[in-house]
Amino acid sequence: MSSLSNASHLMEDVQGIRKAQRADGTATVMAIGTAHPPHIFPQDTYADFYFRATNSEHKVELKKKFDRICKKTMIGKRYFNYDEEFLKKYPNITSFDEPSLNDRQDICVPGVPALGAEAAVKAIAEWGRPKSEITHLVFCTSCGVDMPSADFQCAKLLGLRTNVNKYCVYMQGCYAGGTVMRYAKDLAENNRGARVLVVCAELTIIGLRGPNESHLDNAIGNSLFGDGAAALIVGSDPIIGVEKPMFEIVCAKQTVIPNSEDVIHLHMREAGLMFYMSKDSPETISNNVEACLVDVFKSVGMTPPEDWNSLFWIPHPGGRAILDQVEAKLKLRPEKFRATRTVLWDCGNMVSACVLYILDEMRRKSADEGLETYGEGLEWGVLLGFGPGMTVETILLHSLPLM
């Protein structure tokens, strides 16, 4: 055989291998699980708890301001992995800027994978197949950076097989719920038979601190963020009668908004994670979101809808002002953000886990109301993540009929 024909034969072999390795269908969400830590704090009394727990009750005017901030958030309650008795052991954490990173790490490093594993157990149970069939694990968090990392610890807690392909997404912030869905799509579609366990877990104690008159950004963060974890099972070519496909991940794209790096940024210091947010963040997001939407539709050869109300919506609830301005910019009816506002009210902003919670809320409500699809009876929708950078994750979803 000549060298030319031999090379051609090898190329055919490579192409055949490549084709055999890839799935036939689109990546699909097949199961969802969520988990909370045990301590529930009503938002209308959170200022009392926060100023008492941080030994700041003498800051009367600042407390009044913080209470007003809390009551404007449209949050009803939040969950945390700490209570007042727990925080008494850590006066360095409840101060504003005392060195406390070691203690925060000691709490988060075991706590994050443990909470994530709780959500994963629920997702695996709903999926209905043995955990030994999980081929990939994508774990996401913005706290508890360590080695071996949180993906390793979560896999160990779950008893996943030792050759699971693991990925850890650290320190991406609020847009990362979209990031992990983008990763899951690529993994599921490029590995035939893959079943990807996606886990997002967040603990706010990495950035909890006492109030300071000169740093209201952190006060705003303390009024918004809550603890939580969520998990998905994602795979292509679902097994009929065994797996329950809900949402197809048709397209996933990331966009960085130019000249917006200083709008939202966080920095890890000896005193924990410091939070900075410009008052321009709602306007920055709302002015750029439509371009991201148009891009994701055009990238798959679809014409963007003339009326954005024809879609179902899963935007990350960065805060009330962000939702209000995006809703106004896109001329959306108030009910379009119902699932997002429900999760914001029930749980606060849980960073990367939020959009997965909203996906769960939407599919459950759709089933309860007897609608035709998991996406509020609609066929097409979008999931949006917003976070530091400013970075936007735009996910085009196709909702399947309710089973």
From Swiss-Prot:
Recorded GO MF terms: acyltransferase activity, transferring groups other than amino-acyl groups; protein homodimerization activity
Residues reported to bind CoA: 281, 318-321
GO biological process assignments: flavonoid biosynthetic process; polyketide biosynthetic process
Site (Determines the polyketide chain length and product specificity): 207
Enzyme class: transferase
Residues at the catalytic site: 174
InterPro entries per record: Chalcone/stilbene_synt_C, Chalcone/stilbene_synt_N, Polyketide_synthase_type-III, Thiolase-like
E.C. numbers: 2.3.1.-
Short name of any one Pfam family annotated for the protein: Chal_sti_synt_C
Keywords: Acyltransferase, Flavonoid biosynthesis, Transferase
Miscellaneous field: A.arborescens is a medicinal plant rich in aromatic polyketides, such as pharmaceutically important aloenin (hexaketide), aloesin (heptaketide) and barbaloin (octaketide).
Function of the protein: Catalyzes the iterative condensations of 8 molecules of malonyl-CoA to produce aromatic octaketides, SEK4 and SEK4b, the products of the minimal polyketide synthase for the benzoisochromanequinone actinorhodin. May be involved in the biosynthesis of the octaketide barbaloin.
Protein name: Octaketide synthase 1
